[in-house]
């Protein structure tokens, strides 16, 4: 047990980002309620970041804040804000203003080549294996590794992995790969019929899955800024 009353540690969490393309509070509220109704177990009372970059000239923050709060979503921060007046208004509401990370400038090349590190022997990545059906209401999490399910996943079940997710059976529940922020994570399944699929926080609800892949063997991964899907051969 630590001798200090608190301890600060760095960590990372995956949050959904609500990108506003309309500044009308009622339109925003209705659109969010429609999305929440499609995946209530995943989205109801979920923490979110609100990006206002596309609409900040038109934003009346108090009304938008109330509209989003009325849906049950919890605003953890606002990004994409550059107008000083609006920044002040959001800050006074007690909501953090977030700055999206920028790419670091490349370091100058060293004058002498650095010798490569010695090879690591017997480096093993753990994998969590589930042989039983995953039933509605069950949640399975595979921290720091891949998750393999060799059976069916029912509607209402949830699979979460920091690495890849493989489902060799009917996938009807929710699959969240790259939960720790790994954008290279992927989802593989032999029968794609999921309520929700997510990689590093980028997600599709069932109605976003292209019809030609629904119920088929599929592989999902992140493109530059959105999920992509292709046949699993």
Curated annotation (Swiss-Prot):
GO terms for biological process: cell morphogenesis; division septum assembly; regulation of cell division; regulation of cell septum assembly. Residues 98-123 are annotated as: Disordered. Interacts with MinD and FtsZ. Transmembrane segments: none annotated. Residues 107-120 have a biased composition (Pro residues). Belongs to the MinC family. This is Probable septum site-determining protein MinC. Keywords: Cell cycle, Cell division, Septation. Cell division inhibitor that blocks the formation of polar Z ring septums. Rapidly oscillates between the poles of the cell to destabilize FtsZ filaments that have formed before they mature into polar Z rings. Prevents FtsZ polymerization.
């Amino acid at each position: 047990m630590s001798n200090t009353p608190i301890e600060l540690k760095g960590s990372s969490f995956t949050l959904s980002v609500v990108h506003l393309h309309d500044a009308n509070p009622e339109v925003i509220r209705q659109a969010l309620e429609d999305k929440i109704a499609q995946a209530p177990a995943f989205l109801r009372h979920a923490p979110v970041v609100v990006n206002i970059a596309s609409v900040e000239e038109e934003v009346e923050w108090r009304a938008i804040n109330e509209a989003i709060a009325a849906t049950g979503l919890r605003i953890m921060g606002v990004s994409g804000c550059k107008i000083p007046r609006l920044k002040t208004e959001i800050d006074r509401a007690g909501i953090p203003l977030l700055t999206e990370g920028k790419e670091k400038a490349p370091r100058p090349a060293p004058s002498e080549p650095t010798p490569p590190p010695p090879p690591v022997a017997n480096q093993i990545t753990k994998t969590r294996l589930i042989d039983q059906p995953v039933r509605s209401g069950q949640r399975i999490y595979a921290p720091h590794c891949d998750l393999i399910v060799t059976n069916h996943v029912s509607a209402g079940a949830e699979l979460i992995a920091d690495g890849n997710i493989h489902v060799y059976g009917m996938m009807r529940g929710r699959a969240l790969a790259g939960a720790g922020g790994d954008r290279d994570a992927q989802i593989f399944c032999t029968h794609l019929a999921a309520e929700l699929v997510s990689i590093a926080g980028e997600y599709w609800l069932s109605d976003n899955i292209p019809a030609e892949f629904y119920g088929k063997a599929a592989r999902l991964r992140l493109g530059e800024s959105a999920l992509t899907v292709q046949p699993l051969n």
